[in-house]
Structures are given as C-alpha cells and as structure tokens.
Amino acid sequence: MLSRKIGIDHILKHIENKRVLMRVDFNVPLKEGKVKDPTRIQGSVPSIKKILEQNPKGLVLMSHLGRPDGNRVEKHSMKPVVPKLEELLGTKVTFLNDCVGKDVEEAVKSSRNGEIILLENLRFHPEEEGKYIDAAGNKVKADSKAVKEFRKSLTSLGDLFVNDAFGTAHRAHSSMVGVDHKIRAAGYLLKRELDYFSKALESPNRPFLVVLGGAKVKDKIQLIESMLDKVDEMIIGGGMAFTFLKKIHNIEIGNSLFDEEGYKIVDQLLEKAKAKNVKIHLPVDFLCGDSLEANANTRSFDLKSGIPAGWIGLDAGPKTMAENAEAVARANTIVWNGPQGRFEVDKFKVGSSDLLKHVATRTSQGATSIIGGGDTVNLVQQEKATQKVSHVSTGGGASLELLEGKVLPGVAYLTDIDQL
C-alpha cells in the first residue's frame, strides 16, 4: 500500500501555472520568538524547491505549531517560521494571519505569480482537529457543518495538493484528509519515509532485527505482536524488559519498572515468538542505580543475583551489550524504536550508545537501519550519528503506528498511482 501512492515526481507536468497547496510539518520549537531547531523546515525544502522549479502559479504552505487546542494562541503563531524559511529558500515568503476564510481566499487569489504564502497555524481552528478545549477546560467536538466549510475553504486555496507532513500522517485531521483535489501527492520527505518503511515491512533483506525499548509492555503490545509477524530477531530492552524477566525467570527486580497489565500477556507474546521462530533477546545483566538522578550510586547485577530492593535497572550490562552487538552484526535490516536505558543520564546511556555504534558499523557494511520514536531519534542526534544510519524518521507517532501495522489516514488519502 505504502509504495502505490503518487509523489511529486509523478505530477511535475501538472504543476505549471497551477497553485499548489502543500501540507508541511513546521511544528518547530521556538525560543524568544525565533526558531530554535529548523530540522523540520529543512526537511521540506527539497519538495518546495522542486515545486517552484515547475513554475507554479503559486505555492501555499500550511502547518500546525504546538497545541493551541482550537484557540488562537499567539505564542503558537507560525509567523516566526517566516524568516527561517526565507533564509533556507533564498526568497521572500508572504505570511497570512489566518488559514481559511474570505480574506485568506482573496489574498491567495490576488497573489502575484510564483508567490510563496505561509498560512497561520491550522490548529487555531477547532475544525482542523475536529475538537477544541473551551474556556472551562472541557474537550468539545467541532461542529460538523463548520468542519465541512473549513475543508472547503482550504481546498479553494490550491488546484492540487501535496502532503509532506509525515509527523501528522497518523492523524485524520482536515488538512490531512479533507483537501478535495484529484491530485493528492506525497512530498519528498513523506515519500522517503514511506519508501523506507514499506521496504522494511513488506520486503526486508533478512535477517530482519527489531530493537524495542520503552517503559511499559502494555504500550508496546500491538507493536510487539505486529513485529513478531515480520522479523527474525527481536531485542527487548529498556524499562519494559524487567516485566519480561520477572515473568520468565521469576527474579527479583527491585524498584525497576514493572507493568502489571503487561505481565499478564508476556506468555502469549513469547508463545507467538516461538510459533513464528523469532529469537528474542532480553538483558542478562544490568547496570542499576539507587535513584534516577545523575548523582545516583551504581551497582551491577545479573539474572542469577536478581536486583535487590532499593535498586533500579537503568541500563544494559556488558554481557547484554555483547549479545545485542552479535544480533546487530547478523542483521541486514534493523528497525530501532526505544532506547535501552535511561539515556538522558550519561552513566545510564552506555548500553544505548554502544548499540548505536554497532548499528552504525553494520549500516556501513550494507545493512538498512531505520530509527524511529522521539527518544531514539534524540539519542542519534546527541551522538551525532544521523548520517551513520540509513534513515531517521521524522514522525514518532506516525512511525510507531506504521510498525504496529496500522493504516495512516494521511497516507491512505493520497492518490494511487493507477488513479492519476
């Protein structure tokens, strides 16, 4: 499904003298009214430049920023994005202080040829997400008639639609699934995400290894279930490993994370792994702390000793690291979602950093490596390893839902190649 959707290269001949409406993900962090990290803006620059090369009548960009919950909140305005976007494109960008309505429609219609317009935050309107939070703090559903009008107004701002916002592809929001044009194409950033994930999930080079981390088993049940249908080996680390270890080996886990709900389903997951012939790797030794803080005292324990009361499992030990490295060395496709320990604290980051080093080495030897999920992406950026892996996903929630086997509304809505 993922590879059947049209991209910018399929629609180049349709762009000249047409106005392109493009959904981007410019949800960037701001500091004192300036863009703090432009990575997401940079991500869509190739798509924007390619569209501009085709001499469109104009290009209208729309995005959300932050969580204004359907209200106009000035600190979430898109306006600070303009100078950074102008700098990256080397050309002027016009900012409109709304995203729908008569004034916006008029301004777009009367804009000069080839003009780039950035609309105000889509989420200032309840109709974008289909809900808002009122003055009393209650969640309220948006009026369905108003949602239709909102979508109609957005649609009128272009002749064809390009979506480059992978980060919100798992949301059935108006700007993702409500723009009613025959041509609905993926931008380069979105297409790159889909190409990497479709290859890994539909036709991976084997052995296929998935590395999972995170705190709670119950949050990852669907992910584990889905990946057991696809992979050859699975590393389970991070906080959720202790729930597995307690169930399998009945060891003491001290004050380590324990997920009671997830505990009940461990047997079921292990049975499926056995039936599917998937080799599961769990920690065999651990670095523990007497607190979560940077100044925590540390001690090492293993499966034989268990973890005494007062100690928390916070990272993989050397034997576990060696076993994980061997699994990585065998793999030709690696998908990694979730760090192996409390990587925010340097002394508990070693297991994750070591694993990343081996993933980078294996990538340099020809394996495909995909990094997804906010924490793992942060780790890769901290270690300056972005260029050492095949692909760092820009969408935490979207990549997780893809791996869980879910259909992403924003992707499903794109035009199929055979419909063009």
UniProtKB/Swiss-Prot annotation:
GO cellular component: cytosol
Keywords for this protein: ATP-binding, Glycolysis, Kinase, Magnesium, Metal-binding, Nucleotide-binding, Transferase
UniProt: (2R)-3-phosphoglycerate binding residues: V24, D25, F26, N27, R40, S63, H64, G66, R67, L122, R123, H170, R171
UniProt keyword Magnesium, yes or no: yes
Binding site for CDP: G214, D219, G238, G338, F343
InterPro entries: Phosphoglycerate_kinase, Phosphoglycerate_kinase_CS, Phosphoglycerate_kinase_N, Phosphoglycerate_kinase_sf
Catalysed conversion reaction: (2R)-3-phosphoglycerate + ATP = (2R)-3-phospho-glyceroyl phosphate + ADP
Any one GO BP annotation for this protein: gluconeogenesis
Record: residues binding ATP: A215, K220, G239, G313, E344, D375, T376
Pathways per UniProt: Carbohydrate degradation; glycolysis; pyruvate from D-glyceraldehyde 3-phosphate: step 2/5
E.C. number: 2.7.2.3
Pfam families according to UniProt: PGK
Gene Ontology terms, MF aspect: ADP binding; ATP binding; metal ion binding; phosphoglycerate kinase activity
Subunit structure: Monomer.
Protein name in UniProt: Phosphoglycerate kinase
The species this protein was found in: Tetrahymena thermophila
Organism phylogeny: Eukaryota, Sar, Alveolata, Ciliophora, Intramacronucleata
